[in-house]
């Protein structure tokens, strides 16, 4: 698919932008290592069919990321899987929905920028040369950003790189930018309200405890209903 790009460096930070990201489920080593071949194939097929579309909006320091209207509950829930995210970079505030298995939490906290490590590695994504960057919190994340599009935004609330994130890889999903549209008018933003309210620190502790109790790393699938 092509990416619509028509944003100048001079005006990029004040543009009204709508981006569409596709997300595909990562087939983890744990899944590939399932001994029962029949069960392994069922799980892999379920993951391969788990394709999502997300919408990212950005305007005047406000940002949102949410799943599209084709949202379907496929029975798969992961630790740290995100729902809707809203960030006000002017007020340094964040409202983010995240799951721990099938329980929804609403993180309300001050926005803290990610600490990125930018590498010299490059690759081309949808015709754009991108640079690799990494960051880590409770889970490792790899971003491929494009300086030709100087918007410091990306999927899942990962912001702060000197170019839009064309691809974001987490242990659970890989997100790829498919379309970017320059909007004439500023979009409206929906602030998420559902979920048990916690701070980022409180969520990190709950997430770490759940990961430890399962005896596996973050990002692996916890519940599979068939």
Model-inferred region functions:
Residues 1-19:
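Bacterial Sec-dependent N-terminal signal peptides
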Residues 14-226:
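Extended soluble regions of mature proteins
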């Amino acid at each position: 698919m092509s990416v619509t790009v028509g944003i100048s460096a001079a005006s990029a930070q004040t543009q009204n932008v709508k981006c569409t990201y596709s997300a595909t489920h990562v087939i983890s080593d744990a899944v590939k290592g399932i001994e029962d071949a029949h069960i392994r194939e069922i799980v892999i097929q379920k993951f391969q069919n788990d394709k999502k579309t997300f919408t990212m909006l950005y305007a005047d320091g406000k940002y949102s990321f949410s799943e599209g209207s084709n949202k379907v509950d496929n029975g798969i829930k992961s630790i740290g899987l995100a729902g809707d995210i809203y960030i006000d970079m002017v007020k340094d505030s964040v409202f983010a929905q995240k799951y721990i298995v099938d329980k929804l939490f609403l993180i309300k906290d001050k926005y803290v920028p990610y600490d990125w490590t930018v590498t010299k590695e490059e690759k081309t994504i949808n015709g754009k040369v991108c640079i690799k960057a990494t960051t880590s919190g409770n889970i490792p994340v790899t971003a491929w950003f494009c300086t030709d599009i100087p918007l410091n935004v990306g999927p899942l609330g990962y912001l702060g790189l000197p170019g839009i994130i064309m691809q974001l890889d987490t242990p659970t999903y890989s997100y790829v930018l498919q379309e970017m549209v320059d909007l004439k008018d500023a979009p409206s933003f929906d602030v998420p309200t559902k979920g048990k309210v916690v701070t980022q620190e409180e969520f990190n502790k709950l997430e770490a405890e759940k990961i430890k109790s399962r005896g596996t790393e973050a990002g692996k699938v916890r519940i599979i209903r068939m």
